[in-house]
């Protein structure tokens, strides 16, 4: 059985400071939902397009200003929305994003750009139905980065990550759920899956929850919860 969510699909954004486990959760959540019969599109920001590639190079070298990084992020996101996110949602897919516009607000905001202006510049971007904020103390995140053999980049200092964490916590966006990312990866996945199933129940209640197809879809997703 293939689960479709029409109209509009379901947009899930996974956010948090560096080292919080966003990429791990995004991949495992996508695999879990796919196995349950959902149509899942997994993506990330910055993307692998020209603007995103330039941004990752900047993260390694620190050569761009916060304003220049913000401009590249907006260009990258416009292309991402137009070519991948919006079409997938129109098909009724579940879209999972490893970082999205809240990261721009947190990181460029921590660099001194006004938060309200950053949010306004992202008004074109579809708002997530579910925003999973993986909350983690910066020292733990930095320890994880070093443990995987990576050298912290110029964003990944304790002071900067503290500022980013504060901004993430203060962001008031619909669908925001704070997940304790200091727990093990299996526990984080279970927390996230429960949140997604609850969001899907709300989503289906608006259209198909009272049909046999809608009920079967929700039962299938609920049964696929991680052990």
UniProtKB/Swiss-Prot annotation:
<keyword id="KW-0067">ATP-binding</keyword>
<dbReference type="GO" id="GO:0006235">
    <property type="term" value="P:dTTP biosynthetic process"/>
</dbReference>
<protein>
    <recommendedName>
        <fullName>Thymidylate kinase</fullName>
        <ecNumber>2.7.4.9</ecNumber>
    </recommendedName>
</protein>
<dbReference type="InterPro" id="IPR039430">
    <property type="entry name" value="Thymidylate_kin-like_dom"/>
</dbReference>
<dbReference type="InterPro" id="IPR018094">
    <property type="entry name" value="Thymidylate_kinase"/>
</dbReference>
<dbReference type="GO" id="GO:0006233">
    <property type="term" value="P:dTDP biosynthetic process"/>
</dbReference>
<keyword id="KW-0808">Transferase</keyword>
<keyword id="KW-0418">Kinase</keyword>
<keyword id="KW-0545">Nucleotide biosynthesis</keyword>
<dbReference type="GO" id="GO:0005524">
    <property type="term" value="F:ATP binding"/>
</dbReference>
<keyword id="KW-0547">Nucleotide-binding</keyword>
<feature type="binding site">
    <location>
        <begin position="16"/>
        <end position="23"/>
    </location>
    <ligand>
        <name>ATP</name>
    </ligand>
</feature>
<dbReference type="InterPro" id="IPR027417">
    <property type="entry name" value="P-loop_NTPase"/>
</dbReference>
<dbReference type="Pfam" id="PF02223">
    <property type="entry name" value="Thymidylate_kin"/>
</dbReference>
<dbReference type="GO" id="GO:0005829">
    <property type="term" value="C:cytosol"/>
</dbReference>
<dbReference type="GO" id="GO:0004798">
    <property type="term" value="F:dTMP kinase activity"/>
</dbReference>
<comment type="function">
    <text>Phosphorylation of dTMP to form dTDP in both de novo and salvage pathways of dTTP synthesis.</text>
</comment>
<comment type="similarity">
    <text>Belongs to the thymidylate kinase family.</text>
</comment>
<dbReference type="GO" id="GO:0006227">
    <property type="term" value="P:dUDP biosynthetic process"/>
</dbReference>
């Amino acid at each position: 059985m293939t689960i479709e969510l029409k109209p509009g699909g379901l947009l899930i954004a996974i956010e948090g400071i560096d080292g919080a486990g966003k990429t791990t959760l995004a991949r495992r959540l996508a695999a879990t939902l796919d196995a349950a019969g959902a149509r899942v599109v997994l993506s990330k920001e910055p993307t692998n397009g020209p603007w995103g590639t330039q941004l990752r190079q900047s993260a390694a070298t620190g050569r761009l200003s916060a304003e220049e990084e913000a401009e590249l992020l907006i260009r990258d996101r416009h292309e991402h929305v137009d070519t991948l996110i919006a079409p997938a949602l129109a098909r009724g897919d579940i879209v999972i994003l490893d970082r999205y516009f809240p990261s721009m607000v947190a990181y460029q905001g921590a660099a001194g750009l006004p938060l309200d202006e950053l949010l306004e510049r992202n008004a074109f971007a579809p708002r997530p139905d579910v925003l999973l904020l993986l909350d983690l103390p910066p020292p733990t995140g930095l320890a994880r980065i070093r443990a995987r053999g990576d050298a912290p980049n110029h964003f990944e200092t304790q002071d900067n990550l503290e500022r980013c964490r504060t901004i993430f916590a203060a962001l008031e966006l619909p669908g925001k759920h704070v997940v304790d990312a200091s727990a093990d990866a299996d526990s984080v996945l279970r927390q996230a899956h429960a949140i997604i199933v609850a969001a899907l129940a709300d989503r289906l209640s608006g259209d198909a929850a009272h049909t046999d197809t809608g009920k079967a879809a929700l039962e299938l997703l609920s049964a696929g919860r991680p052990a």
